[in-house]
């Protein structure tokens, strides 16, 4: 109900989303497993492209928005985390920061701020994570989306 009131409703999402549970009568898995349509995921991407704002209204508090796309204060094998915020993976394209969400099966919501570009990819397979912590195919999908966006311009 809270997500519907605070996020889904204001974004004008077309369909209800739902979170998976750890078992049928169990707890919601807030760390993953959000099910929604590609269009509605695209709205989340656009919300993040626009610094948490939608139609001139701040939906996600700016402080939280910024913190969520900043590396979380975590360590990975003794090294400081530089690639994950709050539900957002952090990377670079052409030395510019980007952020993206990724699903278990190759779903992506990618935000490329310096190109004013958001895209959603649904899928059934994702490549293995490379040494930088990102699936190799995310960069392939980014290249395709950038090429398509350039053709449209």
Predicted regions and their residues:
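Structured C-terminal helix/loop/strand segments within mature extracytoplasmic catalytic/sensor domains
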Residues: 103-153
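Active-site Gly/Thr loop motif
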Residues: 14-22, 66-120
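Structural helix-adjacent loops and short alpha-helical linkers that scaffold large soluble proteins
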Residues: 1-4, 52-61, 77
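A solvent-exposed, acidic/Ser-Thr-rich amphipathic alpha-helical stretch
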Residues: 32, 58-65
